[in-house]
């Protein structure tokens, strides 16, 4: 097994792979306790935020979720929930991951500052992909973010002013306030898609839906993404915003969210204006500029290139391929005394060097997680041992 495999950068002249329209297969909610409920309990309804509202509202009352590593738990639990009820889960031969991982892959051609690493393992015909976030990196990021804590909070406050929760708005808040921020609460969509011939199964948080409060889930066509940005005051601000539109487009496009609403705030956190963007049209807004800062074609080529790279190298190391007798064979596992190990891979990106993949080695069950990633009981279920 090669120690390290470099990823060749895609040729811009190559054909542009298509991105299949996402198909919603499941939704689930994180409740205020962070527990998962396989329903729309945490789905919120869009309501236009009042201009002039203060996006520092409720900062001292906020509840932030514990900084615990959840890996791919919500996504894989959803797949098990679907399949054990006779419904379709992922399509084999592709990648199962969070929307945030694919956002990094699709925007890679234009990332000039931040390196990252991801962990990949193969199981039951799919590559599972998550962020490699060692404790020292997490601590460093937390220190850096603490200086911008209030600015980061403004995005959550904008969501509160822009949404009506299932239980309705509290009666004691300012106009439009949807309730104090609790970052435990999330509503997530799970979709099937594909980049070219490579199947994708993706989960990601969705901010709200455009529907009457109290009405049922309208599906992907009613989903909306909410963002904040500083008021644009000069060409430099505008250029920065066009670059930010790349990430806004990628996040929404990957999950099939048709609209992005951006609230523009001043330095004091006061909402000054709002603009709604059609996700599919965002690339055209950038394309008409004299010097467009990004192209969706290069993004799609990048996503396909990395996904193809991963499936080609990681899928053959699936233990159900290398140890086919294990599937459903409880006796063999009992005699071995343990599950066959996962082959753990690391996908590393550096803006100056590009992307490379290397095998970390075989890792069994560590602290209840196979390969350090997937819960042991989920892996046993996938292997037909439950």
Swiss-Prot record:
This is Decapping nuclease RAI1. Its main location: nucleus. Substrate binds at residues 34, 205, 227, 251. It is found in: Nucleus. Divalent metal cation. Keywords: Hydrolase, Metal-binding, mRNA processing, Nuclease, Nucleotide-binding, Nucleus, RNA-binding. Its cofactor is a divalent metal cation. InterPro entries: RAI1, RAI1-like_fam. Interacts with RAT1; the interaction is direct, stabilizes RAT1 protein structure and stimulates its exoribonuclease activity. The interaction also stimulates RAI1 pyrophosphohydrolase activity, probably by recruiting it to mRNA substrates. It is an enzyme of class 3 (hydrolase). GO terms for biological process: mRNA processing; NAD-cap decapping; nuclear-transcribed mRNA catabolic process. One of its GO terms (cellular component) is nucleus. It catalyses: a 5'-end NAD(+)-phospho-ribonucleoside in mRNA + H2O = a 5'-end phospho-ribonucleoside in mRNA + NAD(+) + H(+); a 5'-end (N(7)-methyl 5'-triphosphoguanosine)-ribonucleoside-ribonucleotide in mRNA + H2O = a (N(7)-methyl 5'-triphosphoguanosine)-nucleoside + a 5'-end phospho-ribonucleoside in mRNA + H(+); a 5'-end triphospho-ribonucleoside in mRNA + H2O = a 5'-end phospho-ribonucleoside in mRNA + diphosphate + H(+). Its EC number is 3.6.1.-. Signal peptide: none annotated. Belongs to the DXO/Dom3Z family. Pfam families: RAI1. The lineage of its organism: Eukaryota, Fungi, Dikarya, Basidiomycota, Agaricomycotina. Decapping enzyme for NAD-capped RNAs: specifically hydrolyzes the nicotinamide adenine dinucleotide (NAD) cap from a subset of RNAs by removing the entire NAD moiety from the 5'-end of an NAD-capped RNA. The NAD-cap is present at the 5'-end of some RNAs and snoRNAs. In contrast to the canonical 5'-end N7 methylguanosine (m7G) cap, the NAD cap promotes mRNA decay. Also acts as a non-canonical decapping enzyme that removes the entire cap structure of m7G capped or incompletely capped RNAs. One of its GO terms (molecular function) is mRNA 5'-diphosphatase activity. A divalent metal cation binds at residues 159, 207, 225-226. The gene is RAI1.
């Amino acid at each position: 097994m090669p120690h390290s495999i470099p990823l060749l950068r895609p040729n811009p002249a190559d054909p542009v792979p298509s991105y299949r329209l996402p198909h919603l297969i499941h939704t689930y909610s994180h409740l205020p306790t962070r527990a998962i409920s396989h329903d729309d309990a945490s789905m919120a309804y869009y309501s236009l935020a009042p201009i002039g509202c203060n996006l520092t509202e409720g900062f001292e009352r906020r509840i932030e979720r514990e900084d615990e590593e959840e890996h791919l738990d919500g996504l894989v639990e959803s797949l098990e929930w679907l399949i054990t009820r006779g419904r379709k889960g992922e399509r084999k031969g592709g990648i199962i991951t969070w929307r945030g991982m694919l956002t990094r892959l699709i925007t890679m051609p234009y990332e000039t500052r931040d390196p990252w690493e991801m962990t990949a393992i193969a199981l039951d015909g799919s590559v599972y992909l998550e962020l490699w976030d060692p404790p020292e990196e997490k601590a460093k990021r937390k220190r850096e973010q603490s200086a911008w804590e209030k600015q980061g909070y403004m995005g959550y406050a904008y969501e509160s002013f822009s949404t009506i929760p299932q239980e309705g708005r509290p009666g004691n808040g300012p106009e439009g306030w949807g309730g104090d921020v609790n970052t435990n609460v999330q509503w997530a969509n799970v979709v099937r898609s594909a980049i070219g011939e490579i199947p994708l199964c993706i989960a990601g948080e969705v901010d709200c839906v455009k529907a009457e409060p109290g009405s049922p889930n309208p599906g992907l066509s009613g989903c909306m993404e909410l963002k904040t940005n500083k008021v644009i005051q000069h060409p430099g601000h505008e250029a920065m915003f066009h670059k930010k539109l790349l990430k806004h487009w990628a996040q929404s496009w990957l999950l099939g969210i048709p609209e992005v609403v951006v609230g523009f705030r001043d330095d004091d956190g006061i909402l000054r204006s709002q603009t709604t963007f059609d996700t599919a049209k965002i690339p055209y807004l950038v394309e008409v500029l004299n010097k467009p800062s990004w192209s969706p074609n290069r993004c799609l080529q990048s996503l396909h290139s990395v996904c193809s790279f991963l499936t080609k190298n990681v899928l053959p190391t699936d233990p159900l391929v290398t140890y086919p007798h294990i599937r459903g064979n409880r006796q063999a596992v009992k005699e071995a005394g343990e599950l066959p190990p996962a082959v753990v891979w690391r996908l590393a990106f550096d803006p100056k060097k590009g992307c490379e993949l290397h095998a970390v080695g075989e890792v069994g069950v560590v602290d209840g997680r196979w390969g350090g990633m997937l819960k042991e009981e989920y892996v046993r279920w996938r292997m037909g041992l439950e």
